[in-house]
Design a protein with these regions (language model features):
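Phosphate/nucleotide-binding beta-alpha loop and adjacent structural elements of enzyme active sites
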Residues: 1-290
Length: 290
């Protein structure tokens, strides 16, 4: 089954329509949380869009208002909501550091050592502004505790504070979450940020297994060499890391709903973890997903 990121591509495939699972998420959509929603919802789940309920978090209130008023952003989803707040491991007011390009804004300032070393003009700090932050667990307790499944699939891309957000989401991660896509860094692009190894260890302690990267590795170099004349490799900077709660190795028994979510997420967009699905079916964990 080959997938692309067109809206509802998966739902419209004849092979998928023949599955008992095809109608499961119509009554109760897959709950997807997009943390760092500037620019719109990531296309990770667009092949399943009309059966996905989206909750986005973005501390820039103007950007939230812009997105909410864009029909093409909102209408493709079963439900769509945005929270104009930043997430962290504590509640309060923090500085949002503004960088040359708005997609690089962060609760951490860019690390000048690497900005200068790799001539990263788009990461230069140009100012700051106060933003409200809170724990995802607090927001869940206050607004979503009685609303059914929550954060079954989570994407975090917040330019350096992914680790702290996970620290503030321990309750949520243990409730319904089965898959995570986390932007990770391999050197300290932002001052004091945690790296891939730290995030992997934290999630492993919370019963999530690292499966691979959902996109290409982003690299940086000092640009001293002409790539047309020299064969060279660049330093890996960032990537989107994929984590699953693996029913085969997890100490926690998966619910039928979680198994169904794993099946769908494993096939969406550029994941296509077919071997993962095949293995857990073989081990008997997805016998009754329909």
């Amino acid at each position: 089954m080959f997938l692309n990121n067109k809206v509802d591509y998966l739902l419209n495939l004849s092979q998928f329509k023949d599955l008992d699972l095809a109608n499961v998420f119509q009554d109760e959509p897959l709950h997807y949380v997009d943390i760092g929603a500037r620019g719109g919802v990531h296309d990770l789940v667009t092949p399943f869009a009309s059966n996905v309920s989206v909750l986005g978090f973005e501390p820039d209130e103007k950007e939230c208002s812009r997105l909410i008023n864009m029909k093409e952003v909102v209408d493709q989803w079963a439900n769509f909501a945005l929270e104009p707040i930043g997430l962290y491991n504590s509640k309060g007011i923090r500085k949002l550091y503004l960088h040359s390009v708005d997609t690089n804004h962060s609760l951490l300032p860019a690390n000048s050592k690497f900005v200068n070393r790799y001539s990263m003009e788009k990461f230069k700090v140009i100012g700051d502004t106060p933003v409200e932050v809170d724990l995802l667990d607090n927001i869940y307790d206050a607004k979503f505790m009685n609303s059914g499944p929550f954060a079954e699939f989570v994407k975090i891309d917040t330019q350096g504070t992914e680790y702290e957000i996970l620290q503030g989401a321990k309750k949520v991660l243990q409730k319904d979450s089965v898959a995570l896509v986390i932007e990770v860094s391999f050197f300290e692009l932002y001052e004091g940020q945690k790296l891939f190894c730290d995030i992997e260890q934290l999630l492993r302690k919370n019963d999530f297994a690292f499966f691979g990267f959902s996109s290409k590795l982003h690299t940086r170099s000092c640009k001293f060499l002409d790539k047309q004349n020299e064969i060279t490799r660049e330093r890996v900077m960032q990537a989107d890391a994929v984590f699953f709660r693996d029913p085969v190795t997890s100490e926690k028994t998966s619910t039928k709903r979680q198994n169904q979510s794993i099946f769908i997420i494993s096939l969406t967009n550029n994941f296509i973890f077919k071997n993962f699905v095949s293995s857990i079916i073989r081990y008997g964990h997805l016998k009754n997903i329909g």
